[in-house]
Amino acid sequence: MSGLVTGRHYKTGRPVEVSLAGGVISAVTELPEHPSMAEWPWLAPGLIDVQVNGGWGLDLNTLPLTPDTVSALSRRLLERGVTGYCPTLITNGEPQLAQAASAIAAAVRRDAAAGAAVLGIHLEGPFLSPEDGPRGAHPKEHIRPPDWDAFLRWQEAAEGLIRIVTVSPEWPEAPDFISRCRAAGVIVSIGHTAATPEQIREAVAAGAAMSTHLGNGTHLILPRHPNYVWEQLAADELYGCMIADGQHLPPSLLKVILRTKQNRAILVSDAVSLSGMPAGAYRLHIGGEVVLTGEGRLHLAGSPGLLAGSTMMLPDQAAYLVRTGLARLDEALDYASVHPARLLGLDQAAGLAAGAPADLIRFRLNAGAFEGIECWKHGRKLPHGSGNGNGNSHVVGG
């Protein structure tokens, strides 16, 4: 596909004309300022989310998973500017995970939207901590030590699509498993862990490259030092993924993660099926009875202080960082596009520049929210959704 897209470059603020040809950006030309351009929207790379469990009532972890569910979720995400994502499967039994992985692979084979948007599967479990707190909502009966043979069976069911696996380094089997994953080109992320600092360092030495929703999936009370959060913050080798929805992490911790990780900071939605749904009472297969408030907070019905998942999609999380002064617009967008692309080894890491894939978003920033999001994938303009990032009107913070 070929064409021209105009807007303000998200890094410079200058008006530009982006030329698209053959699915890539062939040129980015800066234009002279003119009064008619004063209200031009912003142009930025398409967003990449490496942890998505569902949205708009579509759940990747309600089984049996169908390819149609994956395809529908892929279309919804593309419409809202998420041009690539990792469908995330959480802890379950071996046959259940194999079935879900197979359904995702089938969707990628059969459906254009899924084939374009799915970058690989994120397997979040079952190789996690069995301890309350770090385990989070993952079912304890399915938690198990890292098992390479089991992983290979899931990878076969996934037709090779598993790209990321979250592992707790507290298991004795973890270093060897991490080394095998690294050799196979699979990214290992540290998460849902009660590991000692020594075990964290050993995991990094074996090849772990990322932290899953850093600061969440922890004990309620940690030692001042040492502890597994500080150790991951201090590991320069690790990309730090964070949920910036105004609910999961306080601004002070988000600021610390952003300052320590810098060009290895990544925004993730960790969105569940209720993302984009109206406020009300719901029932989830994990968590049971839950309440979604008008502010986008999802909590257990009987325990308002306990979160039951994230409901804010990636565009809104980037806007939250800008609105609260935690990041500039260009920084927030890089956390949600360039940085995850670099982690995954994708050409999209070049950003909005000549030679990069023609995956773009164009939007307006109004009252601290991204509005009127338009999306191009492989140089083709896609239909867009309801105009904001997640289908809701939640504005948190600021």
Describe each region flagged by the PLM.
Residues 123, 181, 211, 321, ...:
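Conserved, mostly hydrophobic/aromatic
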Residues 1-45, 388-390, 394-396:
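Histidine-rich, glycine-flanked metal-binding segment
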Residues 263-285, 292-311, 355:
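Short acidic/histidine-rich active-site segments
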Residues 10-17, 325-333, 342-377:
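Acidic, glycine-enriched loop/beta-strand segments at the rims
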Residues 152, 156-279:
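Active-site core of metal-dependent hydrolases
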Residues 53-59, 71-100, 117-129, 158-170, ...:
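Divalent metal-dependent hydrolysis catalytic cores, especially in the metallo-beta-lactamase
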Residues 129-156:
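Conserved phosphate-binding/catalytic loop of the ribokinase/pfkB sugar-kinase fold
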